[in-house]
Regions:
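Bacterial N-terminal signal peptides
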Residues: 9-19
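Bacterial N-terminal signal peptides that target proteins for export
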Residues: 1-10
Length: 184
């Protein structure tokens, strides 16, 4: 009798653990917006933003938050997958049409790579970042207000030096999922 109870408990615990692990691995996001051949999914977890970005490219995918003019003052994260290994960079829009590594400007890298894949001509990058870091090159993001989000992807080349093949700007409320295209 005790053996059956112990086996039943082990089965229940294993099922619960498998359910939890599969939920974590699927990395469900609360919201997602799509723009042409690109998507941006996100979830706010405390003071952290979890992001998933995908595009129909075998090159880089990127996102920027809250520019003041074109790309200026935006916090950018770009990523690609090469030979199965994902890589990201954290940059700051230091000019209307240019962004530079936070580290090179004297800041810190505050985006943390979660993972990335390149399958069927689609590159997907997942990362987390603080909503408010101590880095002056990472402007705070207010999840309750409107956030301007820049989405872009590059040509089929694993290099952060190539110019975007596609780009767009969206106005997003990160706490409700409401979004609309920004008129240019």
């Amino acid at each position: 009798m005790k053996t059956r109870i112990i086996i039943s408990l082990i089965v229940v615990v294993c099922v619960a653990l498998l359910s939890t692990v599969s939920g974590v691995n699927s990395a469900e996001y609360d919201y997602e917006v799509k723009a042409k051949k690109m998507s941006f999914g996100w979830k706010v977890v405390g003071d952290t933003l979890a992001v998933k970005m995908s595009a129909k490219t075998e090159g880089w995918v990127g996102i920027g938050f809250n520019p003041s003019k074109k790309m200026k003052d935006a916090n950018f994260v770009l990523g690609y997958v090469k030979k199965g290994e994902a890589k990201i960079i954290d940059e700051f829009g230091n000019e209307p049409t240019k962004h530079t590594s936070d580290k090179k400007l004297g800041g810190t890298v505050d985006a943390t790579l979660v993972g990335g894949t390149e399958e069927g001509g689609i590159t997907t990058i997942e990362f987390t970042m603080p909503l408010k870091s101590a880095d002056k090159y990472d402007p705070a993001i207010d999840v309750n207000g409107e956030t301007i989000v820049l989405l872009a992807y590059g040509p089929s080349r694993d290099s952060f030096k190539t110019k975007h093949k596609y780009r767009t700007a969206l106005k997003v409320n990160l706490s409700t999922g409401a979004s609309e295209a920004v008129k240019k």
